[in-house]
């Protein structure tokens, strides 16, 4: 059976950048686990704040954390109280000085993680898996997606035998490296157990700007 590689990992270094940007020789494993802890803590603490991505940069004894969210107001809190409490908690967790930046995700319907969380939330509220998928597909296409594919797998509708059902619209060219494809895998906790939710969103092609610039210089 043909298996699919993670579309984000395949495009890192081609059209996507790393989400952790730092260099280490001896402490690599320690810092990697620290990154995982930071991301897990943020995702649990800001579960309802529509966090799309957490980027981490390091310099000496300082950690710069950039949180991409569709609800910046909830993350920052009244007068910045929430973000300050989060910063103190991360300082304690890492033992380093943590600086937090908040960036707003303008189009949540074109972000695979947020779309996946939307489907998962609906499944947890006993909405039909077919309806949940079709609804987010329509919204993504209206928001300007070139193509979208969703898949829900597990004990669908409480069935005894687990299965997977997927829906798609438009095109999702997984082999085209210049295609900007966002991907996410999310879990939904239902009364019948966990359901897996996968989302692929094709947002258009990313043109190789570096090559163009060099060509123009040559002319």
Swiss-Prot record:
SUPFAM superfamilies: Prokaryotic type KH domain (KH-domain type II), Ribosomal protein S3 C-terminal domain. Residues 38-106 form the KH type-2 domain. GO terms for molecular function: mRNA binding; rRNA binding; structural constituent of ribosome. CDD domains: KH-II_30S_S3. InterPro entries: KH_dom, KH_dom-like_a/b, KH_dom_type_2, KH_sf_prok-type, Ribosomal_S3_C_sf, Ribosomal_uS3_bac-typ, Ribosomal_uS3_C, Ribosomal_uS3_CS. Keywords: Ribonucleoprotein, Ribosomal protein, RNA-binding, rRNA-binding. It holds the Pfam family KH_2. GO terms for cellular component: cytosolic small ribosomal subunit. One of its GO terms (biological process) is translation. NCBIfam families: rpsC_bact. Binds the lower part of the 30S subunit head. Binds mRNA in the 70S ribosome, positioning it for translation. PANTHER family: 30S/40S RIBOSOMAL PROTEIN S3 (PTHR11760), SMALL RIBOSOMAL SUBUNIT PROTEIN US3C (PTHR11760:SF19). Part of the 30S ribosomal subunit. Forms a tight complex with proteins S10 and S14. This is Small ribosomal subunit protein uS3. It comes from Bacillus cereus (strain ATCC 14579 / DSM 31 / CCUG 7414 / JCM 2152 / NBRC 15305 / NCIMB 9373 / NCTC 2599 / NRRL B-3711). The gene is rpsC.
């Amino acid at each position: 059976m043909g298996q699919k590689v993670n579309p984000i990992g395949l495009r890192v270094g081609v059209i996507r950048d790393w989400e952790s940007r730092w260099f280490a020789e001896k402490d690599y494993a320690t810092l990697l686990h620290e990154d995982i802890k930071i991301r897990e803590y943020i995702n649990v603490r800001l579960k309802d704040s529509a966090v799309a991505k957490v980027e981490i940069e390091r310099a000496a004894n300082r950690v710069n954390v950039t949180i991409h969210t569709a609800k910046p107001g909830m993350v920052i809190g009244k007068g910045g109280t929430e973000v300050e409490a989060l910063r103190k908690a991360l300082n304690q967790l890492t033992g380093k000085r943590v600086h937090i930046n908040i960036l707003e995700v303008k189009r949540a319907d074109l972000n695979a993680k947020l779309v996946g969380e939307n489907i998962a939330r609906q499944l947890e509220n006993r909405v039909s898996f077919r309806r949940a998928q079709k609804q987010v597909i329509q919204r993504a296409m209206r928001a300007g997606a070139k193509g979208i594919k969703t898949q829900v797998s597990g004990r669908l509708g409480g069935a005894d035998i687990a299965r997977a059902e997927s829906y798609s619209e438009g095109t999702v060219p997984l082999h085209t490296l210049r295609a900007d494809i966002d991907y996410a895998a999310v879990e939904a906790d239902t009364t019948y157990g966990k359901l897996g939710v996968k989302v692929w969103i094709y947002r258009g092609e990313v043109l190789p700007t570096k090559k163009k610039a060099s060509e123009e210089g040559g002319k």
